[in-house]
Amino acid sequence: MNTLSYKTISVNKETAKKEWVVIDASDQVVGRLCSKVAKLLRGKYKPTFTPHVDCGDNVIIINAAKVVFSGKKETDKVYTRYTGYPGGQRFNTPAELRKKEGGVERIIRHAVKGMLPKGPLGRSLLYNLYIYEGTEHKHEAQKPKTIDINQYK
């Protein structure tokens, strides 16, 4: 056998087979859920993974309002943001964010963003993530398949 004939397969944007998947986030720990979602967005579970190409799946998270934190993070963890004005540093705990509209989405999106590559590719991968607090989503036309996130490492 000629080992030089084996070429590494590199996927590009046109040949990447992107799928739509639905994940039920009920009673899932935020960090563990988001690390698996980040791998799905990146395409790490596919045999054709290419580091510099968007070859991951489009991920829809439903029941995001039912995610849980381990330990006392619900009350002790602090999210910091800055308004842009002097003295405009704001602090929120996950318990406070849950009360606000879109707060649970911000919690999950913040966690996934930290687990994706920093740079243009990571920012574009974040557009493939759709988060809904209830059971309904508006992507039925894409025929997403429901997966059990607990089967992934």
Label each residue range with its predicted role.
Residues I131-E140:
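Short, highly charged C-terminal tails/helix-capping segments
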Residues I108-R109, K113, L126:
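Hydrophobic, well-ordered secondary-structure segments
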Residues M1-H110, P120, K143-K153:
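Ribosome large-subunit tunnel/peptidyl-transferase-proximal elements
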Residues G122-Y132:
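C-terminal structural segments of small proteins and small subunits
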